[in-house]
Amino acid sequence: MMYTNNCVNCVNIPGNRPAARALVQGSPDYPLLHGTVSFYQTEQGVLVSAEIFGLPSHTQPCQNPVFGFHIHSGTSCTGNASDPFADTLTHYNPSDCLHPNHAGDMPPLFGNDGYAFLLFLTNRFTISEIIGKTVVIHDMPDDFTTQPAGNSGKKIACGVIMNSRR
């Protein structure tokens, strides 16, 4: 579908209710980090909305925190002492693309005094593909270059994507 500059109501959200949702919780090092990532199926693709609270913040100029944000192929937010979310595995990448073209590569979260809000439309995945997968927030921004996953640091928060229309 090609968009024109006279598009009105280009993204129609049927029922205004997300088809899937992930409740994100921080690791033991980030117990106040939490939020919701919602997925809405539209005719144009999947509309993703993320609202995150308790992100690490900086007080120095030019150090506004930016966080890597991805869908991972694992189905659990469990792990071990050194990597509490090790079981999230790698970025969701069913077509075996190079980074940053994994289906699970999403725009970064920009922190604002511990808060981030993000809204974007994608055709990289469908909602049925990602049910049961995990959403992960990393402590560093994705550089969109380094292989295989963008060098975005340690995993600081995770949520499992669940069907919300049951």
Question: Where do the language-model regions lie?
Answer:
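N-terminal leader/targeting pre-sequences
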Residues: 1-166
